[in-house]
Amino acid sequence: MANSGFLKLAEERYSCRAFENKPVPDELIDKILEAARLAPSAVNRQPVKVWVARRPEVLEKLATTTKYLFDAPLVFVVGGNPSQAWVSRHDGKNRAETDACIAATHLMMEIQDLGLGSCWVGSFDAAAVKALFPEEMEGWDIIALFPTGYPAAGPSERHAVRKSMEEFAGEL
Ligand SMILES: Cc1cc2nc3c(=O)[nH]c(=O)nc-3n(C[C@H](O)[C@H](O)[C@H](O)COP(=O)(O)O)c2cc1C
């Protein structure tokens, strides 16, 4: 039986690295942001922020910080704020990045569910991004960029490569 629901969505999602030259409607952007806003976070601290970049002059500036925006018409920038996050007393770990990654995953999967494409981009100059928007990003670590739009390419070869279930999962 074919999968449905979330598993189907997870199967169908891939890193999209080419986009149509077509804007994403505001109501879809709102849904994507809502999916990210609803993400869980440690002790519900919600130390996460998402910025929307779609104005051509902003996209041009962002493109100086990474090779991986693929001329997308829209980029989500996800930040985590360590001063707002929960810190475990067991190991002293600050969970800002964990919380930001959960919200980022919600965002990425909602993009997929809306029939759009995106790519989680971790290879960018975070200091350069912050230098472009110093007031907005004061206190925030920049965790990921998501170039987003209507897909104009399918998955790369890497998409099909996953560990076997035997390697991936185990019983204790
Ligand atoms: C934390 C993280 C950082 C990534 N950074 C980049 C990146 O900078 N550039 C890029 O093209 N893809 C990036 N990717 C996408 C991965 O290469 C991709 O998810 C992986 O190869 C599996 O392919 P798939 O997403 O198509 O299934 C990143 C993914 C993750 C989760």
Q: What are the functions of these language-model segments?
A:
Residues 1-172:
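Acidic, surface-exposed loops and disordered segments
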